[in-house]
Structures are given as C-alpha cells and as structure tokens.
Amino acid sequence: MAGAQTNDDTFWLGADISGTTELEARDWKLYNSKGEIRENTALMKEIGLNAVRLRVWVNPIDGFCNMNDVLEMAKRARYYDMKLMIDFHYSDWWADPGKQTIPATWQYYKYDEMKYALAQHTRQTLQLLKDNKIDVEWVQVGNETTNGFLWPMGRAQDNMAQYAGLTEAGYEAVKEVYPNATVIVHLDGGCDLRRYEFIFDGLKQHGARWDMIGMSVYPYWDNDAGLTKSYQETISKVVENIHYLNKKYNCELMIVETGAEAKKPQQGKTIMKELINAAMTKCGGHCKGVFYWAPEAEGAYPLGAFQNHRPTAIMEAFTEAK
C-alpha cells in the first residue's frame, strides 16, 4: 500500500546532475548566462532550482556514481541548501526500461540473497550520507522500473511477486536509515496509464509499499514512440494520469525526469513552461515537483538544456516558474 499523503505544499524544481564529478574529471567547464564559470550545483541554484537528484550505481567501473562519489555531490547540494533525491539503479551502470542488469557481484545470488544484497547496498549508501550529516528527502527504489529490475529475477512481467519483494526490501532499508524519507517507485512514460496500473496493482497485490509515484515525462520520446502526437497531448495525459493515480493509490506524484530538445531551445522553453505550469496548477496539488534530467549534457544526448557549456532558454522555464 502507498503511504499517507502529506500536506507540504512546497513545489520542487530540480535537476539530475549525477554527471557533475565526471564532467569535472574531464575538465569540462560550465558557465552561467553571463559567461561566468560555475560549479554545476551552484549553477542550478543560481538558475532557481531547489532540489538535486543523484543516481547510485553499485560498482561502476570508473567509480563515478558509486556511494563515495554520490557523497561528494550530496555535500554540495547541502551547502547550497537544496533538497536531495537519491536514485538507486541497483546496477553497475544504466538501468532503464530496456535494461536492468544485475550487478556483477550479485549475479549468482538466489532470491533471498538478492533481497539482502539490495537492502544492504541501500542501507550502506544512505548510512554513509547520514553519517556525513546529509539529509535525504526522497529515495527511489529502482530507476524507471516499468519492467521491474534486477533481471531476470525481478522482471515484473514474469516475476511480479519477486519484483515486489525486492522493492519492499528496498523500502524497509530506506526507512531504517531515514524514517521520514519519501520512498519513490519510478516508471517511464507518464502519459501511458496502463504501465502504471500494471506495476502498482502488482506491487499492491504482493504487499510492497511506496510513498510516492515518480514519472518520467519526455514529450520527445513519447512522440517518437507513437504514444502521443504532440507535447500538448503528452502533458494533457500526464495531468489526467496524476489525478487518476493519486485517487486510486492514495499517494502523491512527482515528475522526476523530463527534458526537451537542446537544439530547439525556444521550443524547449515553451514545453517546459507548460509542463511546469500544468504540474503546479492543474494537478490539484498532487504533483510535487519537476526535475530536468542532465541539463548540462551536450553531444550525443539530444535532450540536455545547455549549448556551449552554458544554459539555454530551456532553463529559463525553471527560473521563471511561479
């Protein structure tokens, strides 16, 4: 069952800036709109954001986004008085609806051993943060777990009971360290109601708990996949789904990932302004925030919000949000 709804009316404007230390290691400089050099967290604060999202990988080859690296970035968020979301991938690298690879050191575990490993990794990471006086507001148990995680053991379509058991193990581990943290289960495709009912009906049926539903909302990918025909349709469906899911599962929601085309900054600003406005004013107070994913990203990834190492008009949508 979902957790009780809260009365906190703060709206969170955030960004996933998990790549910060890796960019610094590559000597990648960032600048504000005036051309002044800025550290990434400081730049997000300057833009007007009040929250940061950081992913955790179990044993990444290069060390970026392991628990110690996340601690370094979390200290910066604390310095700038920004609320913190921790996003556990439960993988050594990217986890998303198309891949949920078991960490190399966990790959031969049986189900009970996997639950223990997941819980222990969750506890150890969060305890490290807590020991360093870091407050954690939200914790994601899995990243875009539309098809479950820790495949094949926790693939939701084949093993819903095991996916639910693993999710519950994560939930309990979070609450052991941060009893007041909000635990999020996060899916992609916020415009597609069916995938949300499939996962959350399954979790509920098998006794797993969560406090908040996290959504990815990317009009660019929705249009590309044929889920919607326009960004307006994506936003409209997301608003409808937030109302429906809030009522059905008695929990609040948050858009924990979004993005727009970096090469079309004015269009991107329009999309983000409309999405943020809809989240703030059309969801009955049940959407608690919007987080842009990797705004500083440039190059192969098409949905960053920077050009020439500085923010484009897309980020003005966050600065101007009221």
Question: What are these model-derived regions, one by one?
Answer:
Residues 8-9, 39-48, 72-83, 127-134, ...:
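Acidic (Asp/Glu)-rich catalytic clusters
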Residues 10-12, 18-22, 55, 114, ...:
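Mature, Sec-exported extracytoplasmic domains of Gram-positive
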Residues 1-7:
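Bacterial Sec-dependent N-terminal signal peptides
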